[in-house]
Amino acid sequence: ENLLAVPVIMGIKTRSETFAGAEYTYTIEGFIPEANKGIQCATSHHLGQSFTKMFDIKYNDENMQISHCYYNSWGFTTRSIGVMIQTHSDDQGLVIPPKVAPIHIVIIPIYTKNKDRVCKFCLDLQKELSLKYVVKVDFTENRPGYKYNYWELRGVPLRIEIGEKEIDNKMYTIVRRDTGEKIKISD
């Protein structure tokens, strides 16, 4: 819920749905509001001591008494990623929540001349932002519109557009991937 920004429903499975051999099973169901459906994303099975007694697995407790271990089994599945994609993505591609995004910010240099000046500024900004975020500067020779689309498709949470005009005016455009909102900020 906190990492993938997906609504979840947590609970205990019914006896008939409990993992074979388990005393009880907890579940986390990812909820997809648009589809009004839940998909199992994670489970935790409390297996008690049945398996450890069967295989004679023991340990010394804090009083140095020999006891059988309690055992559990759990899993967080790749279905969780599917729920995140279905919940957040749109017609432009992925929308990845910042806490799990492999790249948090992409900087797009825009220039017709003074390429070196713009690129140096972008590198300096990347260095500063990289203290807290994972930042990429797109130095490909593609046009800005192509770059915008490329990174939107991949779900990078924030895009910063930097050109000569922005450097001169000390005003920069930040674009949020989740809402498409363009925010002007000053240096």
Predicted segments — roles?
Residues 1-187:
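NTP/phosphate- and nucleic-acid-binding module
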